[in-house]
């Protein structure tokens, strides 16, 4: 476990994000890389001459599940959410020469739930990797934060995330509102070394370019929530 875990909650609140360097040692990062390399469940794995995305990591990997519940990560998350944080989804993203895509400006608007139940304010619905995903009310998204754990050095050369600070406070944006915000706002590239963590609000506008070099950009993206869902809806990870 790294020693440079100081980060200010006041960084997350106005800007919607914070970068925490050296959270994990090199040996810990190597262990995480080894653990995800053994996952073979075809329903959650996306590959093209090598794996470039794995959904359902909380279910597929005991190591990632332990990571998500670890005090090392949750202490940072709970300081921001000001309460207990529940890991509700984890995904691996990688950019390789064979899977080197760009991601346009967007907000993260969907959550993963145990079953499809019609509840006012929830929709539309989609099915991904065998699980139900739905757009919840904005208030649910405002009570969430994501921890992006970097397994490789990440910079503009290999598709680092770009953010527009403060846009999480604008609520849910339409396509035209996103375009206008991007046109009139300055963005920031989030360069993070392996072992570092980027904390970000789901409603924060973000994008990434295709990498310009042939290298990995592996990130474990864990979503945390501080609230229960409405009606009989349950987070997919707490349905038992």
Model-derived features with residue positions:
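Residue-level detector of conserved, well-ordered beta-strand and adjacent loop positions
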Residues: 21, 165, 201
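Glycine- and charge-enriched low-complexity intrinsically disordered segments
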Residues: 238-240
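Non-heme Fe(II) oxygenase catalytic core, chiefly the N-lobe of the double-stranded beta-helix
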Residues: 2-15, 24-194, 207, 211-215, ...
């Amino acid at each position: 476990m790294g020693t440079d875990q100081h980060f200010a909650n006041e960084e997350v609140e106005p800007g919607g994000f914070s970068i925490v360097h050296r959270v994990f040692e090199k040996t810990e990062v190597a262990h995480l890389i080894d653990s995800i390399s053994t996952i073979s469940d075809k329903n959650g794995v996306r590959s093209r001459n090598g794996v470039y995305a794995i959904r359902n990591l909380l279910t597929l990997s005991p190591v990632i599940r332990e990571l998500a519940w670890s005090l090392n990560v949750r202490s940072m998350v709970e300081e921001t959410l000001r309460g207990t944080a529940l890991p509700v989804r984890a995904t691996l993203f990688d950019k390789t020469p064979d899977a080197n895509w760009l991601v346009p400006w967007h907000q993260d608007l969907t959550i993963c739930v145990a079953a499809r139940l019609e509840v006012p304010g929830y929709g539309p619905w989609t099915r991904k990797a065998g699980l139900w995903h739905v757009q919840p009310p904005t208030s649910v998204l405002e009570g969430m934060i994501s921890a992006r754990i970097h397994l490789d050095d990440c910079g503009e050369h290999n598709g680092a995330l770009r953010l527009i600070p403060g846009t999480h406070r604008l609520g849910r944006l339409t396509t035209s509102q996103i375009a206008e915000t991007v046109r009139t706002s300055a963005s920031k590239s989030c360069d993070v070394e392996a072992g570092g963590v980027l904390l970000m609000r789901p409603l924060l506008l973000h994008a990434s370019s295709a990498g310009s070099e042939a290298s990995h950009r592996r990130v474990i993206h864990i979503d945390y929530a501080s609230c229960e869902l409405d009606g009989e809806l349950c987070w997919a990870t707490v349905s038992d």
